[in-house]
Amino acid sequence: VTPRRFLAPRYWLTWLAIGLLRVIERLSYPHLLQAGRTLGRIGRRLPVHYIPVARANMRLCLPELSDAERERLLDRHFEALGMSLCESAMTWWSSDERIVKLSSVEGVTHLEQALARGRGAIILTAHFTTLEIGARILNSAFPINVLYRPPKNPLLAHIANSHRESYKRGEKYATIERDDIRGMVRALRRNESVWYAPDQAFRNKGAEMVPFFGIPAATNVATSRLAELTGAAVLLYSHERLPHAKGYRVSISAPLEGYPGASAQEDALRFNHFIEAEVRRIPEQYWWIHRRFKGLSSDYPNYYGAAAR
């Protein structure tokens, strides 16, 4: 049930957007993706601060590309962002049957074997444009706990969370707020799996500057400490949108050997190398609009200019 406060005029535009997404979700899958590409192309032409952020990130991470090549990549990236928006509608409202039909899940046995140890499993992933739909696909194959950050818009947060909590595979999966470390520990000690994406700029206590594409980046190094505390296995998880409207592929690695390693920084670098390989494989699907290289202090360069605010 939607609380009455969300009927206030300040939410009317949000309701309009939700209505549009509800209509888009009813389209055939190829037409849904085409609607997303169209929305992305419109967004690409708007004077939004995301564009210079994405350009700066591409220049830093992919210096081997020419300016023209990076602009073409930027075009494809905004199409991917638009498709991601429409895929959120599928994540919230589509049936399990539709989701399963469009998806291929690899490595579930790796997760089952990890949980057979009895100490839980941490599923590490990164922010690509299939992040939301990928979590829904993974949950169609295996119950998971998802670490998430609620949207700033309270109405979107209410709708997203209510639908996330409704995904079932025998039982509801749980959502854990991003800063709820105790909630993560409790889930792992119950021998459950916890999915989270600690790849974005992290400037809180415990952050370290760890190279990403060879550039120091504020990084969350808590994963190895969490694994050490709980004894949980750590697995890498990739997700991608296949070309030609072929659906999605998600893949879970075998548990990482020697993890945690000699230091939390080395473990974080290992994860960053995994992300770098994925970025090079499907560059248009990476979340380029995030200010990944914001430093921990003014001692580090400002790569984004006015967009860094």
Q: What do these predicted ranges mean?
A:
Residues V1-T125, T130, A157-H163:
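Membrane-anchoring hydrophobic helices of lipid-metabolizing enzymes
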Residues P3-A8, R37-L39, G43, Y50, ...:
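Non-catalytic C-terminal accessory region of glycerolipid acyltransferases
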Residues R26, C61-E64, A141, Y167, ...:
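Alpha-helical structural context
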Residues E106, L147, S251-S253:
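Residues in well-ordered beta-strands of folded domains
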Residues V108-E112, A135-R136, A160-N161, E165, ...:
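Short amphipathic alpha-helical segments and helix-helix/interface helices
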Residues R117-R178, R190, A201-F213, R241:
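Catalytic core of membrane glycerolipid acyltransferases/transacylases, capturing the structured
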